[in-house]
């Protein structure tokens, strides 16, 4: 039996909330938790004619800073490279791509708070 750590459970829950949120914004989710040797993409979606790679950051509180603060230039560069790898693996020519970040704050008591930054890179 595999037991997930609380941090991992929170992250999975946040990713599910983010996927639902993005679908409600009109996006079509085409992949989740895609992995390759260079890293992982949380969510891949289509928004009109644009391929969207969404990074999801989930926290219980703001005690250690806003989730957006965890996405630095190195992470954005990695996501850009990963988006190219995803397109190669899926034999998809996606001239229009963007990277979005979704912040989820879920303390388990009140309704989770989601924020969405479009086109951060």
Swiss-Prot record:
Gene Ontology MF term list: nucleic acid binding
Listed InterPro entries: Restrct_endonuc-II-like, tRNA_endonuc-like_dom_sf, UPF0102_YraN-like
CDD domains: PoNe_Nuclease
Similarity comment text for this entry: Belongs to the UPF0102 family.
Cited PANTHER family: UPF0102 PROTEIN YRAN (PTHR34039:SF1)
Name of the molecule in the record: UPF0102 protein AAur_2443
